[in-house]
Amino acid sequence: MLPREIEELLNIILQHNTWRRKETINLIASENVMSPLAELVYVNDFAGRYAEGTVGNRYYQGTKYVDILEDSLSKRFAKVLDAKFVDVRPISGTIANLATYHALVPEGGIVASLPVKYGGHISHNTVGGLKALRVKTVELPWDFENFNIDIDAARKIIEEKRPNLIILGASLYLFPHPVREIANAAKAVGAYVLHDSAHVFGLIIGGVFPNPLKEGAHVITSSTHKTFPGPQGGLIASVTDEELNNAIQRAVFPVFTSNYHLHRYAATYVTLIEMEHFGAEYGARIVENAKALAEALAEEGVTPVGERLGYTKTHQVAVDVSKFGGGDKVARLLEEANIIVNKNALPWDKSVLKPSGIRMGVQEMTRFGMGKGEMKEIAKFIARVLKGEDPTAVKREVVEFRKTFIEIKYGFKIDKEIIDKIFYSLNLYT
């Protein structure tokens, strides 16, 4: 007999699993689901182990299999990304960012980045991680018409302010940033270019989004759980010299991490191999679905941004819902209908705390097998709620709609023999 508190905990887990995995239309742009095989190998003995240091140079014994995994995973990512160096030890995208900033920017140095209101991540700004590093920041300018960095104005700022580091990539990221143009401007003043690829990492590996390392970026950072559908974690990849790569390694440990959540390595490795096999098809379908969702929303009288530009070239769709009460109100209403989105500031908003927009991503629903036809159905569900229909009535239809899309696609199948091997190795079967 288990304690009552454990039974209650298990009930919470089971309720959450059923709700989020089987009954909702999840459109959070920063989330995804792992394949059954990746989830299976995520349960392993590495979860309780330590491996401070680097491959072959650890501060603990008992790490020979950690070394094999970490070394193989880093080298495989490097090959796929055409990078000279990859560090998979950061436990998140933000930690990857902070370690790279620490290695590239001296105390008192200057960082140029997009503010949050233009889509920049909090870790790109002094409201987030940069605040702890004692650096100065300058804002990259925004081209409202093209929903992107203003290239000409950015060149002038780079020439005038001479930053040590320029951060590209974004949290609201509809169209590729002008990496090549910014890299050319950076070269003239000796600045490094970092591209935060967290949102588009899977699209890069799938070949449907430009690889920033091939366009002039010195470093990319990423998380491993958005369009790249692995476990939560981070990585750094660079094409810079050995001295800088060593500086990045020293920043990852001992400055910003001690242990590295080793249990995620195997699941990340499985996901990388799956993306090598299925990533091109998966990535193409993601971008296709995002555009289809935006077009369908527009037909329903809901206003996605970027119409003149084709709405999106990533997994994301951004919608101006100011006429429906703003982002916070709309996100809450949609959750009542089991449609999960997040409120999001749009570039013209006066306050990021009272956003006029919502942000959506189609990567998870795509992995459950949805296509352009389903995007039209989702747009209709959203429009019905926004136009005043009772969310609980829509919710019943959403739950029924999801019953057809339970199996995770673009990954390897598993059988009971594999499950038994893993569980027996951990003494989970008695």
Swiss-Prot record:
<feature type="modified residue" description="N6-(pyridoxal phosphate)lysine">
    <location>
        <position position="226"/>
    </location>
</feature>
<dbReference type="InterPro" id="IPR001085">
    <property type="entry name" value="Ser_HO-MeTrfase"/>
</dbReference>
<comment type="subunit">
    <text>Homodimer.</text>
</comment>
<keyword id="KW-0028">Amino-acid biosynthesis</keyword>
<dbReference type="InterPro" id="IPR019798">
    <property type="entry name" value="Ser_HO-MeTrfase_PLP_BS"/>
</dbReference>
<dbReference type="GO" id="GO:0004372">
    <property type="term" value="F:glycine hydroxymethyltransferase activity"/>
</dbReference>
<dbReference type="Pfam" id="PF00464">
    <property type="entry name" value="SHMT"/>
</dbReference>
<dbReference type="InterPro" id="IPR015424">
    <property type="entry name" value="PyrdxlP-dep_Trfase"/>
</dbReference>
<dbReference type="InterPro" id="IPR039429">
    <property type="entry name" value="SHMT-like_dom"/>
</dbReference>
<dbReference type="InterPro" id="IPR049943">
    <property type="entry name" value="Ser_HO-MeTrfase-like"/>
</dbReference>
<protein>
    <recommendedName>
        <fullName>Serine hydroxymethyltransferase</fullName>
        <ecNumber>2.1.2.-</ecNumber>
    </recommendedName>
</protein>
<keyword id="KW-0663">Pyridoxal phosphate</keyword>
<feature type="binding site">
    <location>
        <begin position="120"/>
        <end position="122"/>
    </location>
    <ligand>
        <name>(6S)-5,6,7,8-tetrahydrofolate</name>
    </ligand>
</feature>
<comment type="similarity">
    <text>Belongs to the SHMT family.</text>
</comment>
<dbReference type="GO" id="GO:0035999">
    <property type="term" value="P:tetrahydrofolate interconversion"/>
</dbReference>
<keyword id="KW-0963">Cytoplasm</keyword>
<keyword id="KW-0554">One-carbon metabolism</keyword>
<dbReference type="GO" id="GO:0019264">
    <property type="term" value="P:glycine biosynthetic process from serine"/>
</dbReference>
<feature type="site" description="Plays an important role in substrate specificity">
    <location>
        <position position="225"/>
    </location>
</feature>
<comment type="function">
    <text>Catalyzes the reversible interconversion of serine and glycine with a modified folate serving as the one-carbon carrier. Also exhibits a pteridine-independent aldolase activity toward beta-hydroxyamino acids, producing glycine and aldehydes, via a retro-aldol mechanism.</text>
</comment>
<dbReference type="InterPro" id="IPR015422">
    <property type="entry name" value="PyrdxlP-dep_Trfase_small"/>
</dbReference>
<dbReference type="GO" id="GO:0046653">
    <property type="term" value="P:tetrahydrofolate metabolic process"/>
</dbReference>
<comment type="pathway">
    <text>Amino-acid biosynthesis; glycine biosynthesis; glycine from L-serine: step 1/1.</text>
</comment>
<dbReference type="GO" id="GO:0030170">
    <property type="term" value="F:pyridoxal phosphate binding"/>
</dbReference>
<dbReference type="InterPro" id="IPR015421">
    <property type="entry name" value="PyrdxlP-dep_Trfase_major"/>
</dbReference>
<dbReference type="GO" id="GO:0005737">
    <property type="term" value="C:cytoplasm"/>
</dbReference>
<keyword id="KW-0808">Transferase</keyword>
